[in-house]
Structure formats: structure tokens, C-alpha cells
């Protein structure tokens, strides 16, 4: 970095891209270190002192308003506010500076006319944080180092009134030597944290613009002989059968010291040991390790490397440990391979996010995410768009996830729209800051086997600065490949990336690339944009995996909604998004793109992901099931097949069978005791179930399923024996053995009683031709285009009924017309033909010159006591025509209140496809039953208009109805992106075609 003329902090540093690190110690690996072997075995180091917990803090709107005396004097400490570290200041004290969300635009856009590298002198929230700590004599006799794991966005460090140093970069560690300034007894640490600095121009990620000490703060005590940095590599030879352990040790105080290195397996057995005299700062030790098991996400085999340092007297000064995974990642014949096998990423992008604490991660949350990802067959994570906390990589090593580790660089707002001050581009004044961010990530994370690619950042255009970063990665670590998507936008330096990476590229365009004899394999670094009710058409992407070897998967955008849990004015909990805190400019709910909600509730999108990412395929047949193990390395062992056999919606038999071992890439047919399949519609469903707890997954976890449907439902013949109609002046009534129906001559069915004679309908049904707009609808304009269907649904006049009587049946025919379309009518027919049921038929004649239809159906407003839903169709979770690969046919139940998925912005949700029968009843089983062929059904408390008008689920209060929507079809939901991509034609329904469907209503 640039030579600093003055070594005491000046506010001008905040706007100087060449000043980003002052008096920091060099970057190093994140290995663990201990004073003794006993400490190492207990994983409790006396050489690390946590400073997490209660701190005192002072807020100022900008640096000029922050008193310097707070840095040097303890006089006011007791008057300051207490905060808990780690924290985001916007979550800990929102009255200081409320949360603010923007996507690509910089948060100061429109407030101040700033250009890179300028920083506001008016708005730059500055928080001075104070922590007192005590040190013992043995501690101060060692080198005392302050370790800041993550501070956003810039930090100035003072200890005991002395200025120590300054650092930028919110997501990699900063270390400062405190040795000259600390003493025995009480010491005072002051951190002044700035929300904005030149680094903020490179931290324009699509996330909440927090500031804070969001990772742990600790003191490290380095003994006289200290392993400062450890590098481990594991090259494989002889067709990946021989492994070598290569280590590089950088040791402080190495003179006349020794290092003893030991490699042990999971059981503690020693596989290798060596001793190395240390005479220089840098030493190398290598050895071939026979018989090791290789690391992969399928089989995350880890070994423990222990390095014991001794001084000239032979005394142990330090014990260091790191996990080692033997694996080799490389490009072979233009295909990325792990341990010689073509790899396919079934990945997600994952922001570090907690709805209660912002970017503060806890062990429990990390474990939950990894467990849920593994249960969804996710095998890879892109750390969008910054290095994660170190523990995340350790857990990925242990439980098996591949990682693209991404540098904390995004400058989207500087080039969209394009400016003449795009950063970093080819600007020499930004080059060192770019390299420093990549170097800090690589040096900390280099020993984690889970990391397969280094990423130069995200959406930062292109240019020489990023190219030089990619070259640095290659020089320092030839064992991994380099990723950067920005080359797709700016191809001046195509060699910045080793893989061709795109965002939101359509399937047809991807195929064009793959058919062009490309030089690089293809991955989607972001695809199937999961904003709200989305991920439609995802199966078209995963279908490319078997078709094109150079298609190597992708990473869903993204894992978790970035929604903050707050109390709404009505007292309900709310998951808040941009604009909810008065934060402007904002991009509203555009950061709620997760397959799970902000509180980590899973959605129907997870059902689809779990199925499409499965690596074990189950194909039932008349005698059993064929199981295909598509894993690359792992023999399928320790699983059961749970199966069910149904005929005409009735259970016939079920069981659970031990699955024999199946080698990678092999198949086996498992005979199951079905007997002769009965006539009718026979459904065989098989589930792959984990027999015992394995890794992070609990026993009973279902990882895959397969289903086959044989034959067709036997139709019961029902004689026409309808009760005689009671034809009045205004209404027509029917009273049968299990039927009580009243139809208005104008308006349709107005009364439908259950078998106890209680009313089920609140009002006559309405046409259902539109839906509450999804986020994708709003993005592609479908919310506007569907206006004509809202008009027909809600503003049509219903004609007087045409009553048609035949022997044993009566039909009332209604025509729905609107003045805006004088020559057009939708016809609805109610036919009573038995003592306990009536048929409803909807005829759509076709309407030319109109957009695709969102839906075709009828909406019934039922008595709110009817809340229990039991459905035979595809489930168990919501599904749509373009997102139902992961659903299976069967009986599924839910409560009407849960029929609406609580997306941050209420929208169309809760649909079930392929429905044959659905009942909506009270607790005693009385209510309404609907049956038909291949219906689509939703049951929830809210009308589309109510969902459309609500900004949050908490706005929907006091439901007075249960809404049963019965449709012939619903348009797909789409998901290629959420800002213009249409629903694909094969999942749409042209309005100019005629459609007819019928269903039966029955009282229960």
C-alpha cells in the first residue's frame, strides 16, 4: 500500500483507496494453537482470550462528531451504552442508525453526489466501542495480538490511550500487535468503527448495509516460538491412489527450535510422524502417506495434523492443529474434476444472515444450515459475496460441502449504469486494495479441503486489477481453480476465470454455448432466482447435467431470505425488508430470495431442490424398485427403502426394506412384496431413508423418493337420481339424502349444507382467473397484463339461470359477461344428478388478443370453521406446473391457516396440482368435498385481492373465511429471474383456446 506520511489516523484515510491497512500483522492461516497437548485434546486454548460480551459504546453521526477523548480516556466509559459483541449496530441500537437495504445502487445515491473514492463527511455513522480486560504476568510476557475476525467497514484501534492501527475489509480478520501497549492488570481497548470508507465502494453487495463488530474479538498470546502460518497441500498421483502431505511452516522465534509433525486418523491412530529442526522463518516438510481415504462432500474423510514446537531446551512452547483432507481438484480435458471424477455442483449462494442478529453467526445456526443443506442434497455453497466466518469452512470440511470462496469485492453500483469512475477496473490506485482482499481470504482459508475455487468477487465489471488478483491466486495456490463471472460482461481479460460462469442465463442460451465447442466448462454461479414463490422451470437446468459433460451445475440464488424479525405495529412478529425502517433509497423485498424464509422456515422450493439435486434415483415398477447410485465416490450403505402401495386412493400395503450396498455408479433392483397389482390406479411410492445418524443427518432423514403410477382410476357408475328441484321465483333448491343446495336464479350456488345441515358457503362462488401477483409477476409485468382477468373475475354480471331438466338430473346454466367484452361470456353449469352431489362445469370459449391466462377456476368462500384440509394430489408442499418434480401423489393434510406460504410480501401460494379429491371440514369431519380429474386446488384464509394489498403477512389479520380455489390450471410461476423473465411457454395457457373442466361437490 501507499507510504503514509503521517502514521496517526486522519479522516482523509477513509476516502483514500491506497490506505486500507496500517500496522496490521501479515495474513495467516486459521489453524488452532494451544500451550500444551492437553489443551489441544480438550480444544481449550489458554493462548486465546475472548473479548466477546458486554462492551460500552458511543454513537456519532460522523467521525467529526466522535470525541477523540473516548479513544484515550476512560472518564466517560460508565456513562456509555452497553452493547453485546459481536453485533450489528443497526440491530443492537436501531435508534442510532436504522437498518438500510439497497441492491445494486449505492446507499448514498440521491443523498450526496459522491464518486469513488469519496466518502460522506456528513453521514458516516461512527461507533466507539470500549472493552476493559485484565492480563496476567504470564500473558504479557508473551506477544499479545488483537484478533478482529470481522468488523464492518473500517476500524481504528486504540489500546491504553495509544493508537495501534487501522484496517478496512469487513469480512477477513485483522490482527494488531498490542505488546508494546499492554500491561499486567486492567487494560482498555477502544475500537472506533466507521460505517463508510473507500472499502464501501467495493462492498456494494445485495444485502443490508450494516456496520458493527459482527464476528468475535479475541486476544492471542504468541509464545516465544510460534507457528504463525501453516500451509498444507495434498497432491495425489498414480491415478489418485498415492497421497503426499506437503507442509510449509512459518515460525517466529525459529532459532534452535524443532517441530514435531504427526498425522492421525479419526480413531487417533498415527499414520505418520516426523521431526524438523527449525533454523529459518520458513520450513518445508513432506511425506507420502499410504492408505489414506480421500476427501469429498460425499465422504468427508479428515485427518488431524498436529505440530508441536519445542524451544532450544526441548520445552513445548506451542501445539498447533489443523484438519487435513486429501483431495485433488483440477481441470481435465476442459472438465472440472475432483479426485479424477467429473463434478457437478448442486449448489446455493448463501449470505451470512440471521433474522435476529444480522450477519452475526452462531454455531447452532451454522450447524442448522449445513444439516438442512445436506438433507436437501445441496453439495456446494458459494460464499456470496465475501469470505464467511472460519467456523463455516471447518464445518464444511467436516460434514462435506464444496465451497467457492469469494473475495469481498463487489462494485455493482459503479457500472450499472456505466460511469466513468468504474472501480476497480484498470485503476492502479485500487490495485493493492483488491489484492489485499483476495490475499487475506486465501491466506486464512487455504488449508480447507472444502474450498475448490477462489472467486475474484462479484459483479465488479472487469479489468486489469481483477485479472492480477486471479493471477495471484494461481501463483499462490495452483491446487485450486479461479472463478469470476464478470468476464461475461467485460471480456477484456478472459483469462481472469478458469470456468465460464454466468448469472441467470436461459437454458437455450446455455445450450448454444455448450454446443459451440467451448474452451471452458460452464457453471451458473447464480440461477433459478428464488424470490418469493419461484424456482419454476428449475428442472430444465438440472436436465443439462447428463446431456453436456461441460455443464457442471450451478448455485441457486439464494439460500435464505434476508428479512429481519421485528414487531409490527399490531404486535405481531414481522419479517421486515427494505423500506420498513424508513430506509431510502431502497429496493424493498429484493433481498428476500431464499429457498427458506428469514426465520429459516422451509418452503415448497425446498421440496423441488431436494428432488432435483438427489444423487440416488428410485424407479418403482410392478415388482419392486430400481435404485441407481449416482454418487461419485460413496457406496450406498446404511439406507432403507420405505414404500407404500395404494390403489384408487386406498392404502393396500406398506413396508420398509433394508437396502443392500450399491457401489458408486451402479444400480440394483430390490424386490418388494407387492403381490399382483390390483386393477385401478395403483401408485407405488418409495423413499430412501437414512437408517442411523450419519454425519450431521439424523436417522429417518428422507433424501430421495420415486413414484410410479399404474393404470387408471375405476370410475364408479352413478345413476341419475337427483332429488326433484324446488323451483321458486328467485331460487332453485334441492334436498337429497346427503344434499342441501340452493342456487339463485342469478348468481349461482348460494347455499351448500353439510350433512348436519349447517351452511358451508358464505357467498356465491366467483370466477377465479387471476392470482395475487408473485414477485416474478411484478418483475415481468404479468401483474399488469392479468388485469383483464381480474376484471372478468370480479366485475362480471351473472345472467339469469337457464334451467335444463332431464330424467333424474337438473342443470342450471349461468353466463358471466362484462361490458368491456360485450361478445364474450364464461359459462358455469351446476348439474344435480344424485342424492348427495352436484357437478360444476366451467367453459372458457377462448378470448383472442389477450395475454396468457393466470388461471381458470372458481373461488368458494367457506365458513371459517372449515379449516381442516385433506387432499389427494401432489404434495406435501405447494407445487405448480413448472415446480412439481419434487412433489408426489398421495394424501396430504394441512390447516387452512397454513395454506398460505408466509413469503415476506404476500403473493400467490399454496397451490396443489394433480388433485383428485380435496375435503375442507371442521374438526368433526363435516364440510365440503371436491373431486375431479387433475385439478389444481388451494385452501387458505385470504382472497387474492387481500394478498395483493398486503405488504407483509402480519397485515392480514382476523380472517373471516376459508377460501377454496378449484382450478383446471394455474400458470407456472417462473424463476429464471425476477426482473423480466417470462414463464416459459410450455407452462402457460393461451387465452384464445377453449377450455372446459368439471368437478363434483359433495357434502360431508
Indicate residue ranges for each PLM-predicted region.
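An acidic-aromatic loop/edge-strand motif
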Residues: 95-119, 168-170, 178, 182-242, ...
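Accessory carbohydrate-binding/adhesion or oligomerization-edge regions at the termini
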Residues: 1-107, 192, 542, 549, ...
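Beta-strand-rich binding/interaction modules
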Residues: 157-159, 242-277, 625-629, 633-656, ...
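Accessory beta-strand-rich segments of carbohydrate-active enzymes
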Residues: 2-24, 33, 38-42, 56-60, ...
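Catalytic cores of secreted or luminal carbohydrate-active enzymes
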Residues: 205-227, 571-620, 630-638, 643-650, ...
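Extended substrate-binding grooves/exosites of carbohydrate-active enzymes
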Residues: 2-41, 201, 316-626, 630-651
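Extended acidic/polar, glycine-enriched regions
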Residues: 183-186, 250-330, 682-718
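Beta-strand/loop-rich accessory regions of lumenal/periplasmic or secreted enzymes
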Residues: 91, 97-102, 195, 296, ...
